Regions:
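Acyl-CoA-dependent O-acyltransferases
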Residues: 1-171
Length: 171
């Protein structure tokens, strides 16, 4: 299909603040904000334009509506485990994004003279192509990004000078 093929962006969203739950409420309170574009649009768009499109899907009314739809599907399903918040995901093409950048983990002090953390990372990834995690911001405002790529995609991305100008491979 080439540049007309549609790519979906799934953005994990903590729905607690949208539905009035306490931020420490136990349980899985995650839904996905969904955005899509053709590959041609993605390739020709500026990063800021794509980011704005994704952020628009984080609007309160949209999150509440989509979460209510998901809750209704779960409620009506005979097998609650069969309900999938990414039902049409094609991991070879689509992107799943989760951001922990707002969490102030580097401000935490472990006490006992240990001080603040040197690094904050997500536990080992489940290998799922197209999965992206933005880690908590460091004290200087940097953000570590975890990407799950195929080996051949990784080999290509590290050879891309324009990409590597903005990042450093650490693992």
């Amino acid at each position: 299909q080439g540049e007309s093929q549609i790519v979906y962006f799934y953005r994990a969203v903590d729905i607690r603040p949208f539905l009035g739950f306490e931020k420490n409420q136990m349980g899985v309170f995650v839904n996905m904000a969904l955005s899509h574009s053709s590959i041609g649009e993605v390739l020709s768009s500026k990063l800021g334009t794509l980011a704005a499109s994704l952020r628009a899907k984080l609007a309160r009314d949209s999150i509440i509506r989509n979460s209510m739809i998901t809750a209704t599907k779960i409620h009506r399903a005979k097998d609650k485990n069969a309900v999938n918040i990414t039902p049409d995901l094609d991991s070879s093409l689509d992107i799943q994004i989760s951001s922990w950048s707002k969490f102030k983990c580097f401000d935490l002090d472990f006490g006992m003279g240990l001080g603040n953390p040197v690094a904050v990372r997500r536990p080992q990834f489940v290998t799922l192509e197209g999965l992206i995690y933005f880690m908590p911001k460091t004290l200087d405002g940097s953000v570590i990004v975890g990407l799950c790529l195929r080996n051949d995609d990784f080999d290509k991305i590290v050879l891309d000078d324009s990409f590597m100008r903005y990042c450093k491979v650490i693992g």
